């Protein structure tokens, strides 16, 4: 159900508060300003950045999205933080 999906998502996001570096480092999306990490929340992937004491969730996308679509989406969402 939608509630179960939300609860799982919420628990994973809250776990980032305790361990922000638990996600997998995504070197293809990282640059000198941002270290992008991702969590696999099947069938979705959550892309995020730790910046100071904040966690910026840049995208939540279905795992079948093309690498180009993921790159464009994540980069576009991080533009406002540059």
Predicted regions and their residues:
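Enriched for short, Lys/Arg-rich terminal
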Residues: 41-45, 49-82
């Amino acid at each position: 159900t939608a509630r179960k999906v939300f609860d799982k998502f919420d628990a994973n996001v809250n776990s980032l508060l305790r361990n922000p570096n638990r996600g997998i480092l995504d070197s293809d999306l990282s640059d000198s300003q941002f270290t992008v990490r991702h969590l696999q929340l099947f069938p979705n992937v959550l892309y995020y950045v730790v910046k100071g004491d904040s966690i910026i969730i840049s995208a939540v996308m279905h795992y079948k999205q093309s690498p180009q679509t993921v790159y464009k989406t994540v980069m576009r969402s991080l533009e406002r933080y540059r």
